[in-house]
Curated annotation (Swiss-Prot):
Xref: Pfam families: Kelch_KLHDC2_KLHL20_DRC7, RhoGAP
Top-level taxonomy: Eukaryota, Amoebozoa, Evosea, Eumycetozoa, Dictyostelia
Keyword Magnesium: no
InterPro entries membership: Kelch-typ_b-propeller, Rho_GTPase_activation_prot, RhoGAP_dom
Record localization: Cytoplasm
Signal peptide: none
Name of the molecule in the record: Rho GTPase-activating protein gacHH
Region entry Disordered, spans: 161-256, 510-569, 609-631, 647-671, 748-786, 861-881, 905-927, 963-991, 1006-1096, 1143-1194, 1425-1482
Gene: gacHH
Amino acid sequence: MSWSSIKLSRLPDATISVWGHTATISGEKDIVIFGGFDFCIEKPTNTTYILHTSQTNGLTKPSVSGSLPPPIYGHSSTQVGRKMFVFGGSLQDNVQVNDMYQFNTSNYSWSKPRPMGEPPIPRYGHSASLIYDNYILIFGGNNTKSSKPLNDIHIFNTERNSWTKPSSNSSTGEIIFNPHDISPRSSTTTPTHQSVNGSNSNSSSSSRVRSATISSHNNSPIVMPLNNNNNNNNNSNNSNNSNNNGGGSPMTTPPTLQQLHLSQLMANGIGMGGSISNGNSDSPPLTPSMMALESSMLNGFKSPLSLSQRLLRSGFRSSPPSARYFHSCSVINGKAFIFGGYNGTTLLNDLYILNIESMEWICPHTKGDLPTPRAGHTSIAIGSRLFIFGGTIEGDPSSSNAHCDNDLYMFEPELNYWTLLKTSGTLPSPRTGHVCLPISSKILIIGGSDAILNNKLKLSNTYHSLETLKLDFSHYSRGGSGGGSNNNIIIHPITSSNSTSSNSIITNYLPHLKPRSSSNSGGGGGSITNTPTTSSLHIKDNSASPSPLTPRSIARNSPKSSIFHDNINNNSNNNLLNTLQEASKFELSPGTPKSIRGIDSLSSVSLTQSIDRNGGSGGGSGGGNGVVSNDRGEFLRHYTTQSILINKNNNNNNNNNSGGSNLSISSNSGSNNSINSNDGLVLQCSTPLCIKKYNSLKDSYLELKQKYQEEREKRLELEKELERYRLSSPITSASSLVDTLSSPNNLNINSNNSTTTTTTTTTTTTTPIPLSTSNNNNNNNNNSTLTVQDQVTTSKQILEIYEDIYNLWGYYEKRVKWKENTEKEANQQLEVIKSKIDLFTSMVGLENHFSFNDDTKSCCSENINGDHNQQQQQQQQQNPQFQIDDNISETNSQISEPALIHETLTPRKSRENSVHHSRSVSNPIPLLSQIVKQSKSGDSTLTVPQQLHSSHNNLIQLASISTPQKPPQQPQQQQQQQPPQENGKEPSKSTQKIFKLLISKKNRASGHFKLSSSNESSNSEETTPTFSNNPNLINDEDDDSQQHQQQTNIGSNSISNINTSNSTTSLSSSVSSTSLQTQEEFEASERSKQKKRLGKALKQMINKDRQLKETAAAALAVSNSNGNLGGGGGGGSINGTTNVSGNGANNLGGLVLTSDKEKEKLEKEREKSERIEREKQEKEREKLEKEREKSERIEREKLEKAEKERLEKEKIEKEKLEKKHKKIKGLFGAKSSNKESLPFRRDVIEKVINHLRENSLDTEGIFRLSGNMESVRGIVKSFAHGEPNLSFEVHNISNALKHYLRSLDPPLIPYEFFLMLLDARKNEDAETIRNIFWKIPSDNRVVLTLLVDLMVKISENSNVNKMNSKNLSIVFGPTILKPRTPTLDRMALMTETQLQCGIIQTFIEDFHYIFSEFPTSGPKSFLGDDDYDSSSFGSNNTPSSHSPHSSSPTLNPAVTTTTTTTTTTNTTTTTNTTTTPTSATISPNIIQTNNCDSALCTPTTLSSTAAIIQSNNNNRTDSNRNN
């Protein structure tokens, strides 16, 4: 469970240096942050931030619009749908406000709705929670004018923008509120962040004294349980802690309870028979059968007194919490949990629960690690758990002496249990006034301050996150003893405190204890003496914990005197006292292993604790304070995984009045301290629960014992390794540390009467070092006592030193192992390279020319090459200068130079026509690269027939070289010229196997085989590679002998080639085909085809070879008969190869002549085969092209068919949708049209508007009466061409303008402003409407301004033309302002149409405010003074048409109209079917004479909707009639 720190932004100045701000979650992972006090500029701010948590550096500052709230802090914010509601807060001048603002997170616009009802008084530091999806619960806060905090409740309806304050019964405190009035939609509530604020303070470097726990509300003490072991609430004026289970202190008369449910009683653990559950109870939850039994017993009770008494003991309260601010409130499962806060004088830590359904207050008794009193903290709900973080824990939150913390608490409502969570990682700094939000299962901490306001401490550019799914609750056991019936007690960690007395170091990891007896009864007070007994320690297994068990020492201070009433209110002291008092009640389970991680031995340490309490002896439950005497009392100390046996010393050392608690370490007199391991556990309870726990503990014990044995064996092995390493390792630091630890002078623990004491330590490596002990009998016993602090310090040093030793040893082992593996891999790779080069050189005929100098024996070369190492050694003996270094690597491919760099190496004579290998990697082998470079220029000039013939001759030479035979008789000169043989041994592979291996790897990608340049002619000089830095050095002395030897070998080998077998010939053909592959002019894709093409030529060449053999045989017969044999039948070659046929060199000339003819025929055949292959390839290409075109055509047809089907489906769906729209729009008079949208022409619209301004102001029913549709269509077409035809009647032109504006796509007011304007109209926010108008594109804005100006002039003359602002808004509302997607729901469409018309009406009435760049007056359309008269609707007379109100804007602000004219006309309608329309008066349900205010947004304006429908229907009727 670890905190992580995340950057807000890449920008260094993008920090949230505020406190008292608020934040809500918008969507899934976006956070909206607003307001707060910026302590860098020392004033509030109203900046809005958006934090995208799914992105890195996701903090942005959007551009907002609308009516922004003023700079405030201490406010609250609640997210409801896509709107964030902000309420209250404090301004810079310490003045509070009670305004409600809302922020639309979809378009980043602010608005201020006009709420109904009585709002709460101005406040800050309150809490706001969301209930029933659309209601906000406001509780508490502070108002500086009233000089006292608040505890009232207000509920805000976000849909109706209305406030409601539930009333309360003064006698019972019950809140009278009907939950059905707010019509909850579902029982599921969404946890919402509450804004809490507090003053900042610097955390002092010294320890802090936490403030007292608030123990009463409304000056009445909280009822404590009868068994006074619960220290959650302490009375600051009373230090009396009763230890009697049978009685308790007197209580004040509690208030009566109303509407208490049995399920609530069961959930809070109310027992039967007058007994109650203790604050530390670990009783199992009630089963349904137990609840049924409880219900029946409750129903059987006739005395109401017993029931109310049991309810009081359970902690229920019907009175509301005390007044407070800077508290926290979270909603879980229909209940609001209010915790902590500040009441003006004291910090609070009480918890109240408000049942939202019944509106009842409950104050439960909680268990566990109750948080210290705090304010300015935050609380969030994740699942069914409540988490509380940070806050001010001491002093006034607004003072400079306040202190903060960063503790994280968790509360489980089902168990009423608090847990202090221990976290790691990058913890948030202690802070207050921050925000805490739940994102899925994560806790996010943003902003806040850990300093006072005038300190300007700026937090880092980060926010913190904690994943709650990784919480391991196995460490946080729920335990306690209720009435002496529990067998498993868990002592929780002790919190820190300070005083002026000496400090003692205690650790916060205490063991599990088992009660010595099942009850602890005592009738009176008196003296209670704890008798020490022998017990052993049971260590909890934490080996499965994800993080190692790390000790954390906490300073625990003793009081100045034995009287504890000074610090009795401190939770830390009380917890410590309870720990010391309960130490003698429990005995530790025997048979516990010595350590989880291999502890060698346990030191026996006896800790002396003397505590006196002054008071009366023999007092009863209501008497004086009892005296608890604990002589040489037990004290438990558990350092990490080290267990210290607690031995009871019966010697009475009177240290009670020594001025403080004396804590020391000493050993028992006259005894050896040791641990007796028992394999069995003592079971003192026979209940099924005890038996179950006993079995689980026994299994755990056996498992831990087995682990201990295994770890001990590992430790012994490691000690041996350390000893060997100390003697052999060059690192002396580790061995010196071991010697230092092993020396007896490092740790001296003296014992009484020469008693042997053993001290052990453990580390995270589970392998402790045994430490030698010493007995100093000469020291004084009074001066030889080692304090606990000294031993803990020594133990820490030992742990750190040994941990360093283990880390050094592990690092050294890794480095040694890595070095061995690296060397082994390097040697293996080097040997593989050597073997491959040796194998390659043996294949290409260079095995006798060089070898590797094998300094380190390779295990690979002997296995791969057999006796090749012996050949290398012989060659090295003959030529010691000719050596190649072993250092061949990928990074440095250059073969190291020989010892004599500047001397010329004497190379051996190579074979004439050798095949060389060139690697295709970036770092070729240098030796082979030199050979290739020398032969590269010659190969590039050979033609294909020449290379074929050269490859053929080269194959003959290699065949003759690779199969040496010792001749029977050799001249001495020839023997000197021959290369040295290796004791007559033949190569390990034959020629045929070598060439088969080459043929099988003909497609290898590592390189190509090339021919040397010596194959061009038989008389060319041999190019011999050298292996020095100068490749051009050649031994000139051997040139003549080499040429002579070459000519002789060519003749002998050519003749011997005639008698070679067919297999050898086929091999030569394969090699020649392989050599053809190396030509760069052929592309890689055509190589396989070339092989097939040349196969036929090779077959023909084989046939020619057979003919040559027959011809040679005939020539030999003739020569034998004439006696012209050259060299005899046993003539030998240079290489010792015997001519099989015994022929001489006299037939060489005839063979040369036949080879020229062979070349010509081979060339012709090759050309013919190439032509045939080319034709075949073209045919295949054409065939493939046809197949590809066919497949593409088929695929294209499929795609066209699918696209056609899709278009048909879309057309059908579109027709259906259009029919549906036509049906819906036909109801409201809108005619559906499939015509394409017309282009937007600003100049055309301006001309039309100017024409209407000059000719239509006095025309009755302008824009209302329809004209001739044919004329209207003609005018609209002229609009599209840019030349409007304005020679028609004015009604035709006005209707053409309406049709043209309706056909624009996008409309005159673009789609993206539709929802924004609707929200602003709904909230009656003219300022937001004005801001949105100035965001419209410039051309649209100019046209809209001219159009609204025309409507203003028409409405000013409404007494003549009968068209006021409301009638004009009905005409132009759905025309110039419409959504991107039509609304299908009829009720939603009706509401949408009302808002559309209302926006146009606002444009007309607030023309000078909205359309002026610098308005001279504010908006007046929402003042509510000129609401229309609803009684005028439905009358048969035409309502009076008022002139514009005095506040109605005109083009000239100085000109206003103040008179009102009343006219009465009879209503007439025309139904003739002529093409020319007749003048008609306006229906009374259509024309509204009064200005419309908020009536459009209220249910009373349905008549206006009827007017819209009637208007649209009349338009449709007139259009159909004219058509």
